[in-house]
Amino acid sequence: MNSKKHLGHTARKRFGQNFLHDTSVIQGIVAAIYPQPNQFLVEIGPGLGALTEPVGELVDHLTVVELDRDLAERLRHHPFLHQKLTVIETDAMQFDFGALYTKENLAEKGQKLRVFGNLPYNISTPLMFHLFKYHDVIQDMHFMLQKEVVKRLCAAPNSKAYGRLTIMAQYFCQVMPVLEVPPSAFKPAPKVDSAVVRLIPHKELPHPVKDLYWLNRVCSQAFNQRRKTLRNALSTLFSPENLTALGIDLNARAENLAIADYARLANWLADNPPADVNKDEILDSEE
């Protein structure tokens, strides 16, 4: 029976809750994070504390961001960690990680945020995009995600998994798969396989762009029409002559270009923006 109740709490579908309970998987994740006593760690979606407890035992202090009111209250009264925990009851999608970095004076301490969590799969992609905005104040991130999302994060050009999420993630971070996790490690068991990924923000961006909007825009337009040649998919942004001058094969498709190519296209658009552009539009995060 795949019960939705675990440790007295019923998983809430609207929060995408699946609670990790497999001890060997938990140990593997904690070993990958390798928390140290004086570091500033932030857990997103601590849930019932499967990762909170073993990490909390190894550090001096742990900040957790939890949207579920009942779970946040449980953590505030945790039997042996409550004095170590700062519980922030809010939506991680709206949370200002930069303000936390400033509030804790981490720059003066020579530290950055170390972020980890078992992310709700229904918001994992937009949450990743939110976190990338704070790449300069984050030391590293370790996340449990849907296995297919991890494949996309780690993908190389010329593969089916390669897409906008790949480019945006690898633009900001070095991305490494850590371990795969079966559905049986959770309660209730999800219908998909999971995996843990490590993201380490680049100290210096290898392919900096002048305006991130244009990197998002060109990737969205290319991958939303990934079966088309770039000559056709990007026709509203570039003439064939422009693409050729930028070293782009007109018959190539979205997955054939490296991050450096997309950065070059984005920088050209920053200098030569189309007249009818609306930079306030919301870019589609799907591919």
Swiss-Prot record:
What reaction(s) does this enzyme catalyze? adenosine(1518)/adenosine(1519) in 16S rRNA + 4 S-adenosyl-L-methionine = N(6)-dimethyladenosine(1518)/N(6)-dimethyladenosine(1519) in 16S rRNA + 4 S-adenosyl-L-homocysteine + 4 H(+)
Any signal peptide, and if so, which residues? none
S-adenosyl-L-methionine found in the keyword field: yes
Q: PROSITE patterns, alphabetically?
A: RRNA_A_DIMETH, SAM_RNA_A_N6_MT
Query: Which positions bind S-adenosyl-L-methionine?
Result: N18, L20, G45, E66, D91, N118
Record keyword Cell membrane present: no
Q: Which family does it belong to?
A: Belongs to the class I-like SAM-binding methyltransferase superfamily. rRNA adenine N(6)-methyltransferase family. RsmA subfamily.
Please identify the protein, giving its name as recorded.
Ribosomal RNA small subunit methyltransferase A
Q: Which gene encodes it?
A: rsmA
